[in-house]
A protein has these predicted regions:
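Alpha-helix C-terminal capping segments
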Residues: 147-149, 161
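Short amphipathic alpha-helical coupling elements at transmembrane boundaries
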Residues: 3, 72-75, 143
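Juxtamembrane loop-to-helix connectors within ABC transporter transmembrane domains
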Residues: 1-9
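Predominantly cytoplasmic-facing regulatory/coupling regions of multi-pass membrane proteins
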Residues: 11-16, 21-127, 152, 157, ...
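Membrane-interface helix-entry/capping residues at the boundaries of transmembrane alpha-helices
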Residues: 1, 156-159
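Re-entrant/interfacial helical elements at transmembrane boundaries that shape
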Residues: 132-147
Length: 187
C-alpha cells in the first residue's frame, strides 16, 4: 500500500513540475510582490521544475536496482512508465485548469497558456499554505493575478462554480455510490 501511495504522490508532483515548468518557461508570468517570492517572474521556477522532471527521468533510466528506504524496496519504474506518469498527471493538471478557464468570464488578452501559468501558480500557493484544498489562498491568488482581465466579482462566481464542479460534485457522486454499495452489500 505504501508503494502505491508513493507512486501516486510522485506522479502527482511530476505532472505539476512538467506542465508547470513548461508553461512558466513559455509564459514569463510576473509574480506580484505581495506573494513574497524570491523571483519577479515564474521563468526561473519553470526552469527548476523542468530540471526536476528531467532529473527524475534520467535517474529512472540510469538506476536498475530498487531503491531501499527504511528496509523496504521500492521498484524503479521503467522509462515508458516514467513518461506515462508525467503525461497522465500533466493532462490531469491541464484539464483541471481548463475547467476553470472555460468558466471564466470572457476576457481579452487572456490566453489558455497564460491562464495555466496563473492557475498553476495559484495551485502552488494553495498547496504551500497547508490549508486543506488551498481554500482561500488559491482564490486570492487567482483574483490578484486575473484582476487586470476581469471584474473580481465575476471571477469569484467562476471560482465558486469551479470548486463545486471539481471538488464538491465528485465528492457527492462518490458518497452516493458508496452509500448504494453499502446498502446493496447488506442485502
Amino acid at each position: 500500500m505504501a508503494k502505491l501511495v508513493i507512486f501516486c504522490l510522485l506522479t502527482y508532483w511530476l505532472g505539476f513540475f512538467a506542465i508547470g515548468g513548461t508553461v512558466f518557461v513559455l509564459e514569463h508570468q510576473n509574480i506580484p510582490a505581495v506573494l513574497h517570492l524570491p523571483f519577479a517572474s515564474v521563468w526561473p521556477i519553470g526552469v527548476i521544475f523542468l530540471a526536476i522532471a528531467g532529473l527524475y527521468v534520467l535517474l529512472m533510466a540510469l538506476r536498475r536496482r530498487p531503491l531501499k528506504v527504511g528496509g523496504r524496496e521500492l521498484p524503479i519504474p521503467s522509462i515508458p512508465v516514467s513518461f506515462g506518469q508525467i503525461a497522465i498527471s500533466s493532462v490531469d493538471w491541464f484539464i483541471s485548469g481548463s475547467v476553470l478557464y472555460v468558466l471564466l468570464p470572457a476576457a481579452t488578452g487572456l490566453t489558455c497558456p497564460k491562464f495555466l501559468a496563473i492557475f498553476l501558480l495559484a495551485q502552488a500557493a494553495g498547496m504551500l499554505s497547508y490549508i486543506p484544498g488551498g481554500l482561500g489562498v488559491f482564490e486570492t491568488v487567482i483574483l490578484l493575478l486575473l484582476s487586470e482581465f476581469s471584474i473580481p466579482s465575476a471571477l469569484l462566481g467562476s471560482l465558486l462554480l469551479y470548486r463545486l464542479i471539481y471538488y464538491i460534485l465528485p465528492l457527492a457522486v462518490a458518497s452516493f455510490l458508496l452509500a448504494v454499495h453499502e446498502i446493496l452489500a447488506r442485502k
